[in-house]
Amino acid sequence: MERPPLDIVALRLCHCRAATAASEGALHIAVQLYRACLEAAERREDAQAIHFFAQKLSDCYEKMGLRDKASSFEALAKA
C-alpha cells in the first residue's frame, strides 16, 4: 500500500473516494481509504482531521458489524 497523502488536495481526493465507496456499500474499500486518510492526518498532526476520520472509520466498521473495531475508533474520535 502506498504512503498516505500529505498534501491537503491528495487528502481531500482520498476522502472523496472513501465517501463514495462507503455510500456505494463498498465498505472494505472505504475502510482502506479512510485508514490512509487517518494516517495522513496523524502525520500532519491535525487533531480535528484525526477525530473526523476516526469517526468515519467507526461508522464503517459499525455498518460491517465489527463493533469492537468501531468502538476503538469511536474512542479515538472522542479523545
Q: What is the predicted role of each segment?
A:
Residues 5-6, 45:
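Structural signature of alpha-solenoid helical repeat scaffolds
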Residues 12-13, 52, 72:
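Residue register of alpha-helical TPR repeats
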Residues 55-79:
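TPR/TPR-like (Sel1-like) alpha-helical repeat modules
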Residues 38-40, 78-79:
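Amphipathic alpha-helical segments of tetratricopeptide repeats
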